[in-house]
UniProtKB/Swiss-Prot annotation:
PANTHER family: RIBOSOMAL PROTEIN S19P FAMILY MEMBER, SMALL RIBOSOMAL SUBUNIT PROTEIN US19M
Name this protein carries in UniProt: Small ribosomal subunit protein uS19
Organism, as annotated: Sulfurimonas denitrificans (strain ATCC 33889 / DSM 1251)
Gene: rpsS
GO cellular component, one term: small ribosomal subunit
Alphabetical keyword list: Ribonucleoprotein, Ribosomal protein, RNA-binding, rRNA-binding
InterPro entries from the UniProt entry: Ribosomal_uS19, Ribosomal_uS19_bac-type, Ribosomal_uS19_CS, Ribosomal_uS19_SF
Biological role: Protein S19 forms a complex with S13 that binds strongly to the 16S ribosomal RNA.
RNA-binding found in the keyword field: yes
The organism's place on the tree of life at top rank: Bacteria
Pfam families in alphabetical order: Ribosomal_S19
GO molecular function: rRNA binding; structural constituent of ribosome
GO terms classed as biological process: ribosomal small subunit assembly; translation
Length: 91
């Protein structure tokens, strides 16, 4: 079920403070975050986030197409190795 419209989007306070200070300074330095649950807002466009996927930090450059999604959607936590292929018989 989606989040209620009257509540508004969720963004961790510490992350929003970092975003606003980066915008004020004009800094291009990536913001390191573990907050995968935070929603991407229009204020975040043009900022690079290093989003933790449980093992490493994945760089995510936010564009206008990312607005409304969560940061964790752009940093996959699982790697798909593929299914075992059919074995060719010799002979």
């Amino acid at each position: 079920m989606a989040r209620s419209v009257k509540k508004g989007p969720f963004v961790d306070d510490h992350l929003m403070k970092k975003v606003l200070s980066a915008k004020a300074e004009g800094s291009k330095k990536p913001i390191k975050t573990w907050s995968r649950r935070s929603m991407v807002l229009p204020d975040m466009v043009g900022i690079t986030f290093n989003v933790h996927n449980g093992r490493q930090f994945v760089p995510v450059y936010v564009t206008e197409n990312h607005i409304g999604y969560k940061l964790g959607e752009f940093a996959p936590t699982r790697t798909f190795k593929g299914h075992k292929g059919s074995v060719q018989k010799k002979g």
